[in-house]
Design a protein with these regions (language model features):
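Conserved active-site tyrosine of GNAT-family acetyltransferases
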Residues: 20-25, 98, 126
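Vicinal oxygen chelate
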Residues: 1-9, 31-85, 93-122, 133-143
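Conserved active-site region of classical short-chain dehydrogenase/reductase
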Residues: 18-21, 92
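Short glycine-/small-residue motifs
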Residues: 128-131
Length: 143
C-alpha cells in the first residue's frame, strides 16, 4: 500500500471496494492498490495513471463525509456520463472473464480498422469501460 500522491485525481463512488478491486485488479489486471489512509479517512482504492489517480471510494463513506451528496446519489445513478478508457493485455481472456461474470457488454470484442482490438462494457457499478489492446502487427505512425 502506498499513500495517494498524484497531482490530480478523479474520485468515483462505488458500492463495495472488494467488488471494484475484483473487477479492475482481478479481471482487467490493472495496478489497483489499496492506499494508506489518515486516521478517520475512508478506505479507498487507487489506480495511478501517469500522474493522474483514479480513486475509488465507497458511496456510503462519501455520504458519511459529505451528507449533502446523499440526495445527489439517490437522484443520479453511478456511471452516468462517465467513460473510462484502458489499454489492457490479453483482451480475449478479459472478454471471456467479463462474460463469465455476467457483466453487461455494450459492444463485444472486435478488431477495429485502426489497429486495435476493442470492447465496451459496464463495471459492477455501471461505469462505462472501454478496453483496447494494440494488434501485434500494428505499425507506429511515421514508420
Amino acid at each position: 500500500m502506498k499513500a495517494h500522491r498524484a497531482q490530480h485525481s478523479i474520485q468515483l463512488a462505488v458500492t463495495q471496494l472488494e467488488v471494484t478491486e475484483a473487477f479492475y485488479a482481478g479481471i482487467l489486471e490493472l495496478p489497483v492498490q489499496r492506499s494508506l489512509t489518515a486516521a478517520g479517512a475512508p478506505d479507498h482504492l487507487m489506480l495511478d495513471m501517469d500522474g493522474i489517480a483514479l480513486v475509488f471510494v465507497e458511496e456510503d463513506d462519501v455520504v458519511r463525509a459529505h451528507p449533502v451528496l446523499g440526495n445527489r446519489f439517490s437522484m443520479f445513478p453511478r456511471g452516468i456520463g462517465v467513460t473510462l478508457h484502458f489499454e489492457v493485455k490479453d483482451i480475449e481472456d478479459i472478454s471471456d472473464a467479463i462474460t463469465e461474470e455476467g457483466l453487461e457488454i455494450l459492444y463485444p470484442l472486435e478488431i477495429k480498422p485502426y489497429g486495435i482490438k476493442e470492447m465496451w462494457c459496464f463495471d459492477p457499478d455501471g461505469y462505462l469501460v472501454v478496453l483496447d489492446e494494440a494488434l501485434q502487427n500494428r505499425k507506429k505512425a511515421g514508420s
